[in-house]
């Protein structure tokens, strides 16, 4: 049996994007602050990441075009909800 996932995420690009957004405290706090005032959806998640990484890839070179934005949006939503409780 083989799996087509990467560390529980759809692919490496999605995992790496989530890793960058959640493993750097300053970036994580910036993300939380941004999404307290913005609707959490795929378009806004991608826009936020493009602001962070204008070259359209993570600092590790993973293309944002390959990211599963549904998973990133869910992760952001869960992070914001957890922080508010």
Where in the sequence are the language-model features?
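Acidic interaction surfaces
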Residues: 1-85
């Amino acid at each position: 049996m083989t799996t087509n996932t990467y560390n529980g995420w759809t692919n490496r690009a999605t995992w790496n994007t989530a890793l960058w957004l959640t493993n750097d405290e300053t970036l994580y706090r910036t993300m939380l602050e941004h999404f307290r005032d913005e609707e959490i959806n795929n378009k806004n998640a991608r826009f936020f990441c493009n602001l962070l990484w204008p070259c359209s890839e993570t600092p590790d070179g993973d293309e944002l075009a390959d990211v599963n934005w549904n998973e990133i949006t869910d992760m952001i939503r869960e992070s914001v909800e957890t922080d508010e409780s």
